Amino acid sequence: MENKKKKVVVAFSGGLDTSYTVMYLAKEKGYEVYAACANTGGFSAEQLKTNEENAYKLGAVKYVTLDVTQEYYEKSLKYMVYGNVLRNGTYPISVSSERIFQALAIARYANEIGADAIAHGSTGAGNDQIRFDMTFLVLAPGVEIITLTRDSNLSRQQEIDYLNANGFFADFTKLKYSYNVGLWGTSICGGEILDSAQGLPETAYLKHCTKEGSEQLRLTFEKGELKAVNDETFDDPIKAIQKVEEIGAAYGIGRDMHVGDTIIGIKGRVGFEAAAPMLIIGAHRFLEKYTLSKWQQYWKDQVANWYGMFLHESQYLEPVMRDIEAMLQESQRNVNGTAILELRPLSFSTVGVESKDDLVKNKFGEYGETQKGWTADDAKGFIKVTSTALRAYYANHKDEKENI
């Protein structure tokens, strides 16, 4: 009786490491290899077609594209906008949020076809190995995890030589920079990134400033979700994000350098360009200042910071994340209206908002101008009561009062 071949799903990006993995497992191990590309919005149709062609050349018995772009938005990006999530106040968590949903898609596919193993191309030096492995351990228990790049410690040249020797040729030239292009921004690694004292030159960016002067950008939100760009309505939030990216990228907006702590405990630097995330989050946060109460903003910021941290730390499946999402969703019921931004080369500023839920417009008074909801005596009484705790403290600690 013929032995059944081991069925392996390779998380296939089309890059060097995953190309090597497909060929090695098919040729050297004799496995039945299924190449699966999980697309969260970063691959073009042309790239996906090339991936399919190459997967079969490398020895895969089947190639599939798992399009999880809408799921990525509905289960992650939407909440990151609600929470104005920027890691360390800077980075829109572009790559880490994508990886989780790529891993989820691969795990589901492996379960669907009854795979014996899942393989991915992560090295042992970064965060992605944790995001993939943890997801597979939880959602595909009992399925073997194969990581040739991490386990064999092969050099890029060794992998290229192996592929070439077996008749597969592609442009795997080691560029000065490596890029991860996604719906929610592009990360840039390598080159000057490795030197803490240097920034990135203009040539490192994929998108360049092609516009001069300035223009206004109007972003309209309904219950916290982006619905219109410059009064053009979008039923598909993905297309709305892409429209904002198109407008903002022409001004080179969204460039910055993120420095943070990796899950494995070392610090790392990454450059990025993310026009759409920075403009959408900037507009959304600005609108919330008008439409949410002080304590709504405060507590939402606290839980959103935790949400972003857990997302980055590969804790998306932690049950508390669903609780935080419920809180973020509820917080958006009055976040309605249009935020107006002023765009200029490499930067933007906030202008104003138009909203039926604008709390600045009220019948009680205008800041620094007039009050209609209280009298002068009311104000004096309020101030006196508010000062009670401090007056009581310093009445008992006169020595501290004298040293102020």
Predicted regions and their residues:
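Nucleotide-activated chemistry modules centered on ATP-dependent adenylation/adenylyltransferase
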Residues: E2-A11, L16-I404
